[in-house]
């Protein structure tokens, strides 16, 4: 087989294009909603408007799991691109401006009609845990025709978020992108995203891991949920023969990375005050993939992920503030 041509993009992500509205709330607010604390619940447009009215104005900032990852990776010097659908409305313009300003290539045409740009109500409780209610809006309009075959073939890593598996059209877009990437000999990375996403799509996710995924990102709850066990070691034993690398984050306990026949235990990077855990897993993936595409060893990749995650949980919002590259370089020198 002829090796693939050198890519001009390091990481291409497919994901939901979302603007987050972040609010600090007490646990009583979460208890009064039909949601799972710490998880993501899908809601409709009417519910989103009602929740916005209940919570009041919050801090608006661009989000979306895979989008957060490629923004973080771009800040670390990685050549990145993103595929996701917004509407040509105010929030769509905010999302487009923010992701391009971060240095991420974003060419998906906005929808001119249909649902508005996706919005996620992120409720941060005093323990810094985030609970999300997401109205997918225009994101559900993403389909196979939005996948640029040439761009996928020209990208070293195709990164997919599990959340995107919910809308059927987006699911088919992911399947098409996977076929193209595998045909070109590129790596496919998947983030399981959320334990409840795993519950919804366990059979499909198991099939993806069995047949298509090279790099798997998950937290311990997602990984154990995937294999229907409470035993993390058992889940690792199940996944290790199937993927090149599995990276499992464990909150304040750091991360465990298995690959190349080795297991790397990565300690959590001290974050000082933990303000908001939104985006921690996204930024771990960003740091890891930055190291991976730069040819770093797995331990260094994990350390880069841990440092990036620690930065993003030290402030409100799911995207890094300035200086991430210098911070990671200082903590994990080449």
PLM segments and residue spans:
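Glycine-rich phosphate/adenosyl-contacting loop at the front of the ribokinase-like
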Residues: 1-81, 93-94
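Conserved phosphate-binding/catalytic region of the ribokinase-like
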Residues: 1-12, 17-18, 31-37, 179-183, ...
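Alpha-helix C-terminal capping segments
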Residues: 70-79, 123-125, 291-294
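Hydrophobic beta-strand scaffold residues
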Residues: 80, 106, 188-189, 246
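A glycine-rich helix N-cap at a beta->alpha junction
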Residues: 98-115
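Conserved phosphate-binding/catalytic loop of the ribokinase/pfkB sugar-kinase fold
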Residues: 107-111, 122-168
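Conserved beta-alpha-beta core of the PfkB/ribokinase-like small-molecule kinase fold
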Residues: 157-237, 253-255
């Amino acid at each position: 087989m002829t090796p693939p041509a050198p890519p001009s993009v390091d990481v291409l992500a497919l994901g939901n294009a979302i603007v987050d509205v972040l609010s600090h709330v007490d646990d009583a607010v979460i208890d009064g909603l039909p949601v799972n604390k710490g998880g993501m619940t899908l809601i409709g447009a009417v519910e989103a408007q009602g929740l916005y009215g209940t919570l009041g104005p919050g801090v608006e900032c661009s989000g979306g799991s895979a989008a957060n990852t490629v923004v973080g990776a771009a800040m670390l010097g990685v050549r990145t691109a993103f595929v996701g659908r917004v509407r040509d409305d105010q929030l769509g313009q905010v999302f487009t401006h923010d992701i391009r300003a971060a240095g991420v290539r974003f060419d998906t045409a906005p929808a001119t009609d249909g649902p508005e740009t996706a919005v996620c109500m992120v409720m941060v409780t005093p323990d810094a845990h985030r609970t999300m209610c997401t109205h997918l809006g225009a994101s559900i309009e993403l389909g196979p025709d939005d996948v640029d075959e040439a761009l996928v073939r020209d990208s070293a890593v195709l990164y997919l978020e599990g959340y995107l598996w919910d809308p059927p059209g987006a699911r088919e877009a992911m399947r098409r992108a996977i076929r193209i990437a595998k045909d070109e000999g590129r790596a496919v990375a998947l983030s399981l995203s959320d334990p409840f996403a795993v519950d919804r799509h366990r059979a499909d996710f198991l099939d993806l891991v069995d047949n298509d995924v090279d790099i798997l990102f998950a937290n311990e709850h997602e990984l154990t949920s995937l294999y229907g066990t409470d035993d993390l070691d058992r889940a690792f034993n199940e996944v290790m023969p199937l993927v090149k690398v599995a990276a499992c984050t464990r909150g304040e306990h750091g991360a465990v990375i298995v690959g190349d026949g080795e297991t790397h235990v990565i300690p959590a990077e001290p974050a000082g005050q933990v303000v908001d855990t939104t985006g921690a897993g996204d930024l771990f993936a960003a740091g890891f993939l930055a190291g991976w595409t730069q040819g770093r060893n797995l331990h260094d990749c994990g350390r880069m992920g841990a440092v990036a995650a620690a930065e993003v949980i030290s402030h409100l919002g799911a995207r890094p503030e300035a200086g991430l590259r210098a911070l990671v370089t200082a903590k994990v020198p080449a």
